[in-house]
């Protein structure tokens, strides 16, 4: 009876663990997503910079967003963008890294440091290398070295890092709120005419690329650790069996 009770109690926990594991993306799927981000980045720049119709449409979309400008709208937009200034962005990164360490997840903390450090750096490096003159509609003007947007990159890097650090049960809420924040930052950049729509999309893709690479690294590390633990357990079991064969338990002495 006790054996059946033990088995029934253990099964839900085992199945729950298996379910959580199956919901985690594998290293291969994360790398595939990173590849899609690279393709998306290339297509976004090629279409925006080299296709005349898209070149003009980009400018028209920017002009349409600037028509939403109002004093209170501009104030809110500036407030959101101020949250991503370098000093504050660094504080967000330090907070998330510290939270990951407190939760006993140093690898996640390292992944957050890489994403929040390398994603904005990538955006700022690409700007002068891929600069091209933008079409202009009305009085809105954006300088050539604007693709991809550093603020859009920072916003998505922050959101994805927060999702990665958050407990599993809290991730849907963090992702939903973070998605609203990232979209609001993108709209703010357009309303204030800081960037073209293609710049914002490029920034989103840069941050997503680095997070996909970080998740691939985490999953590969988890798999190696699980393999090492399994091998260690197998060796330990073998050692116990050999020890038992060498030192059999003596039979009880009859009285």
Q: Residue locations for each model-derived region?
A:
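Alpha-helical transmembrane segments of multi-pass membrane proteins, especially transporters
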Residues: 63, 111-116, 174-177, 203-204
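N-terminal transmembrane-helix/juxtamembrane module of multi-pass inner/ER membrane proteins
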Residues: 1-88, 92, 127-140
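Structural signal for the C-terminal ends of transmembrane alpha-helices
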Residues: 6-7, 11-15, 98-106, 162-169, ...
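Hydrophobic, lipid-facing residues on alpha-helical transmembrane segments of integral membrane proteins
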Residues: 38, 114-125, 205, 209, ...
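Hydrophobic alpha-helical transmembrane segments of integral membrane proteins
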Residues: 107-139
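Membrane-embedded catalytic cores of phosphoryl/pyrophosphoryl-handling enzymes
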Residues: 139-254
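Membrane-water interface at transmembrane helix exits
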Residues: 44, 48, 62, 98, ...
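Interfacial segments of alpha-helical transmembrane regions
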Residues: 28-35, 93-119
């Amino acid at each position: 009876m006790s054996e059946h009770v033990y088995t029934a109690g253990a099964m839900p926990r085992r199945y729950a663990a298996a379910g959580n594991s199956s919901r985690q993306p594998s290293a291969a799927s994360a790398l595939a997503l990173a590849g899609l981000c690279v393709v998306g980045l290339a297509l976004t720049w090629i279409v925006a910079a080299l296709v005349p119709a898209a070149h003009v449409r980009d400018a028209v979309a920017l002009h349409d967003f600037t028509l939403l400008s109002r004093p209170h709208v501009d104030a809110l937009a500036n407030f959101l963008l101020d949250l991503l200034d370098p000093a504050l962005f660094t504080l967000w990164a330090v907070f998330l890294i510290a939270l990951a360490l407190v939760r006993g997840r140093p690898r996640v903390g390292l992944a957050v440091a890489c994403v929040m450090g390398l994603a904005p750096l990538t955006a700022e490096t690409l700007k002068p290398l891929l600069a091209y003159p933008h079409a202009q509609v009305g009085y809105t003007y954006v300088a050539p070295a604007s693709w991809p947007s550093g603020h859009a990159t920072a916003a998505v890097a922050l959101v994805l890092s927060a999702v990665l650090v958050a407990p599993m049960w809290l991730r849907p809420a963090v992702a939903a709120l973070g998605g609203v924040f990232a979209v609001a930052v993108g709209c703010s950049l357009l309303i204030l005419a800081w960037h073209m729509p293609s710049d914002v999309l490029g920034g989103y893709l840069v941050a997503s690329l680095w997070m996909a690479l970080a998740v691939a690294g985490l999953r590969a590390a988890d798999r190696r650790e699980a393999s090492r633990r399994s091998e260690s357990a197998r060796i330990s079991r073998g050692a116990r069996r050999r020890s038992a064969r060498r030192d059999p338990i003596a039979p009880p002495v009859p009285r």
